[in-house]
Amino acid sequence: IGGSGGRLLDILQVLYRKNPHMRIVINAISMETIAELKEVLDTFPMEEEEILQMQVSRVKKLLSYHLPQAENPVWICSFTFRETGTDPMDNAKKTKQNAGETGNGKNGEVQR
């Protein structure tokens, strides 16, 4: 999965409902997608998860020198869904609601 346009959780929810044992591979280059990956890891039951960061350099010739120039890093996250019998998005919503009710603010005050 790549180029999710900020809808990664929605895409994965549909895939999980179709096959809760599916193998997933997600490519990420933007900080926004990398942040979404953290939410994915916290939301969906999974096994065999692996996260890689790959860096590639291209060699450019400058006069008599060959200089490596770094390209942007690519993150690759792979995992297999694990079936639990419940919808992971429902569990995530409940967790967010509970966090909103009991979240600690400055000096321990409750935030809503």
Say what each PLM segment does.
Residues 6-14:
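A short, conserved alpha-helix within the catalytic core of class I
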Residues 1-3:
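Helical hairpin unit composed of two closely spaced alpha helices linked by a short loop
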Residues 5-6, 31:
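Short, surface-exposed acidic/glycine-rich loop or hinge patches that mediate macromolecular interfaces
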